[in-house]
Amino acid sequence: MEQIVTFGGITIDNVSPDHIQQLYSVKLNGTSNNEEIPTEFPNIIQSVCSCDKHVVELTMDVFKLVDTTENSSCAICRYQENEPCIEHKSSESNTKCPIAQSVSCSHSFHACCISRWLHTKKTCPLCNIEWQLIGANNDSVVIYFDDKNQEFKLSDNLVEDIGRQFGIDMDNYIVCKNKSPVTEYKNSTYALCTRDRHNSQNGQTNLKIICEFDSKTENLFIKYSTTIEELRKLVSQTFDLFKDQVKLIYNNIEISKDFDNLTVFNIGIKNDSNLAVECYKSFTYDMEITNNFMVLYVPDTFNTTNSSNNIQSVVSGSIAWIPQPFIDNVTNKDLRCLLSSLYILVKKVNLNTELIQSVTDRFEKYMELYGMHYRQIKLAKDSLRCLLEMNHFNNKDRMILSCTFYELIDRIQRDNNINKNPLLSSNLICNLILSDKQVNEQTKINWKFLAKDVRITKVFNIYSPLVLTNSVPPLLTLNKNLDVVVFTGKGKDVSLPIILYDTLTNSETDVNAAELGKIVSDKGDLMMVDDRIYEEAIMVCIDTSNSMSKASDFDEDIKLKRSSIIETKNRFYEILKTESHSSPQESDIRQLTNTIIWFITHPNFEDWYRKLYSQELIRSIACFEQKVYPNFAMMLVKYPWFFNKLLTSKKVVVNNTWYSFIRNESNSNYNETKYSKEPLQEFLCPISHEIMEHPVVAKDGFTYEKSNILKWFENKSTSPMTNEKISKKICDNKVLKSIIRDWKENNTVIEQSDKLSVTIKLPDPWNETVIHYNETDNIWDLIYQIYHITGLSHDQYKLTSNYWAIDKSSLIKQISSKIKIHPFEKKMVDVKICDKTYFFGTENTMTVSSFYTVGNLLYKLKSRKYHRYAVWYGLKDSGDGFQRGTILSPHDKLIDYSEMTLEIHSSNRYKTPKGNHLSRLDVVKKLFDAYINRSIAYSFNTAIGLMSFSDKSVLECAISPFYESFREKVNELDTSGATALYECLKDSIENLIEWKNADLENRSKAKLRIICLTDGKDTGLDKFKNTVKHKSQYHNVTIDCILIGSDYDNYLGKIGEKTNGYVFNPSTIKYALDIMELETMISSTNRKTIFYHNTIDEKTIPPIINPTKKLHAKAISPMEIISKTNENTKLSQKLIRVQREIVDVMKNQHPDIDVYINEQDISFWKIVFKGPDSTPYKNGTWLAYIQFTEEYPNIAPNIRFVTPIKHCNINNYGRVCHSILDRNYTPNVKISLILQCIYGLLLNPDVNDPLDTNLAMIYYDANGLYEAQIIDYVNKFALKSREEWNQELAKNQFKNW
């Protein structure tokens, strides 16, 4: 008897079930099987919904008839109750309608009106409460459950009462109204349903389960209605397992596959439940021996695919693919690669019998070449055939193929000294058996050549996610976990443009190609995913120098800025328009008095008094002070006569009261304090013979008033009493000070007067005094008296009472206790002043009081128009002729800046706010954002880098195809420094060259380009200019410049001209954004060589390369082309397909579309579109062309309009934006359908996905501007008739515009 063989060429002597189970540590069907975990659940909860039973039809039974009420009206028809209702009036009936009253809310209505209302509404039209049935209690609810109903009292324990009455666990049920869960109850009817029957939007009926697998814990959020099968699939995706491999255990009971159709609610899974997940690592196998070859495989119990023609059901996640027990070290990542590769293989043979035979034969030869057992070869070949034919492919075939592929790849790798998981190279073997190369039975495979063949043939290449947006599925690619998956199509959502199929979990996901490409590149080798053949590399250079903070100089900005300045200036000078008066109005007397006192007691009064032009001076003061003292400023311009009088005579009378700058202590309104007793001699200062306030003891042993002795010591060093030389040290006499204070309080005499009085503590050397005041006097009046007593200006001290600061607008009589003056420390400081308002500038040092402010300084140094000046400190050069520093507020104290040099500069207080215009850098950021958006939309094979420059150039983002995230970096840029323009251009050229040389295989033909966004004025080193010029020309680097602003370097334009670059200097933001939408700016690959000697103006559209010769070639009708085609002519696959499309277009001819085929080249068509009626295009006809490239039909044909057309989905170069040419294109799409879709754009433009955003933005405007622009283009370019086009194209008389 011949020996039994199995995988790996292993021979088996004994194939009894017990021996096989022991040999492979498996279980076989038909043998005893002791289950350790029970699989039957003790209680299955049945689903219940009672919603249809709780709905009770409302009828007139919920109302009772009552008598009419005078002056009451029906809430529905609004007629009086004692009048006929609207129905009776319309029928001209004179009978009165009965009045029906609700038993729920007691509101009354005409019976006819309420009967009609009940057909659609169940609530009262007045109070909106729900009507109840007669007999129902107001504090109860009726619950319907299954076939039962029960009335319950409304209470806090209602839910518990319901559960107790019906004998159910309320954790499994919810109370519903109209099939929606409720939490607040009122007098009504409700249904009791199980939680799986209704899913609320607020998540009330959803639940969280905690899944644990191999020390991993994940929270899954599902619905109660989720089936066990859906849960099993979700768990498999979460933990990366085969769905059939997932074992779910709940409460120590396995949820077997018998329960897959039940919901999680049915088996009692509750919120926050723990679910144990295990993996079937050992299965119950069937054993089958065919031609003495033994195979163990999982029975076809759960995934029967016999005779199925669905590829996803044939090649998808199933435990049958796991090659256990023969091979143990296979991971899910390995199996994904195998299944994805087989998916592509099945798709490529496409039920082609001849090709299937070729593939299986080659598979057989390679297995023989590497010495695999002939019985295994026979079985594996048959299994592969079943797979490719998708016919009778079962789990036994899955086991055979997974083991055989593993073994064949492993033998090839061992022969090449490769150490890698075999199944991760499944795509290489699939490519090998699909290729048409002859199998050399004498020479084994070179692994390097095998990998190279994959890249050459491209069928089983693992493609970059970035490539997929322009590729035809299916293709192998990587997901975010670097697993091999299959790109199966393009999504409907523009933001998620590709669909990936995970063969292991049998699931599809829509993803963003750019984001996925970035993730994959961050996790692995960039070259592994970036396998595109690049057409162009672009370095975007952004100017961030100081000059970029200036206004853009755009027309709209200039107008806005000018109008904003005028508006702000007018608002600033609005106060000067106030009408002046010679005598004060009654309501202004108090405020005018306050202003006069403020003016007199101002520390700069003497400076104002010395200056000429008092009228203009007063207006200047008003403008300068209006922000802080708006009331004083208003008085200055409203009553200028009073202040002119002060500036000429230093005194003025208001309301019969004189106010003077000249101090007159004898006439001041205050009295010295008097005492009932003579003070003791010890209380008097020996120097002044006055009662002491701050007694101090000197070294001579005598006590003096502190201020007096200090003044004595300024000029002398002897004792005032003994005339002997003494030390100047003194110390406080606190005991005497306390005794004097008590004596004053007990002996002060308050004289009777008609006026009110207040005690005020004056600073040294003045004594405490009593000041008299009138009933209406406020603190400003007190300040005036203090000025005349002490000469202190109003900003040299503060007033307090009981340690609280006093508001200057308060009435004096509101102060209940003694007022104390706290003078600010007065000392003189030197301040360096550099006045830059003069042509040559002046520098000097001023000695000013410590309480002097910036405003006081300007009042002292300038004669008028103080608001036109600003004081700065810390000014330093920051490049581009800019200086940076800190501008001081008029109220900043000069003492804080005594060690610095302050500079006075001219300044506009009414300048336009920054938010009212776009800075040049703001414009650049918007342009960059628009450029990135367009680059993503066009999906050219382009890599982009980002540099910024000010004092130096900085590489912000290296050249990469993952440029979508660059916007975040650009938004962070800010202005500073000079403009090292040419240094940045030099560094950009070097970066581009380095990028190109790093991968010549994919980048050698890539064009190199720089897009420079700048104001164009270089302030860096001139030595780089020639370097940039020579390097850019030598390495063919194109330099495009978009100049923002009115000043730029002409040398930059010359370099752009020499490199076939563009130089734009847009005058409006609209034109600037239009530039970024030019196709030749997005990619220069189709840019026509043309030299501009200056900046490109707004009306010029840079030309694109068109197939000129083919456009001018003779074209004939499809019928003539077909008749001329020679049946014996051999055509390529592309032209055969084109020929079919010609026939299809003839069969499906559109009435407004004419098709012409080039006589000498059927791959070039000319199309004439007639504008649809009832659209702005109705009077026009347009010529377009279709060019079928070599990649057709895998890639959509190139279609462009030749006749200029104004359309938001067609760009300036005639390129059409439609999903059928992009994400919705497949090789099966007919040209006739594409033409119909383009015609459909003329009928209904897609304004949500435009190429011309400006036109799309005005589409919905009712001003007719959208239609006017289109009609203007029609009249300029598209008035040629279809007959004229026919003659031109047939006679080869086509003319360009």
From Swiss-Prot:
Residues 1133-1279 form the UBC core domain. A zinc finger (RING-type) spans 74-128. Transmembrane segments: none annotated. Pathway: Protein modification; protein ubiquitination. GO terms for molecular function: ATP binding; ubiquitin conjugating enzyme activity; zinc ion binding. The keyword Hydrolase does not apply. Keywords: ATP-binding, Metal-binding, Nucleotide-binding, Transferase, Ubl conjugation pathway, Zinc, Zinc-finger. Catalyzes the covalent attachment of ubiquitin to other proteins. Also acts as an E3 ubiquitin-protein ligase. The RING-type zinc finger domain mediates binding to an E2 ubiquitin-conjugating enzyme. In the C-terminal section; belongs to the ubiquitin-conjugating enzyme family. This is Probable bifunctional E2/E3 enzyme R795. It comes from Acanthamoeba polyphaga mimivirus.
